[in-house]
């Protein structure tokens, strides 16, 4: 898990630097814990990997006051987990779904677990 954490941290910091992200911006995560483990997408979902990735990103992004949005899988129509505060700020429509590891994906499930006040929105625009 330490290797995954280090790779996530490195990638996040590089993206933030190149994008010139600032406080209040939204960093969107989409991906597959199965692929991180070297398997076909959706075939070996890992809650442990999902939690490690999300917790690592939150550690970095919260310090910079950047929101994390986490895309779910096709089972929840690729809806995005965000903090309620962001959904209200930007007037995103909240949908009624709670991600699960095999119906939403491990990243969205971890986000729903670790966010302060998580909600799920249909899409982000802007």
Residue spans for each PLM region:
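Ligand-binding beta-strand-loop-alpha-helix segment within the catalytic cores
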Residues: 64-126
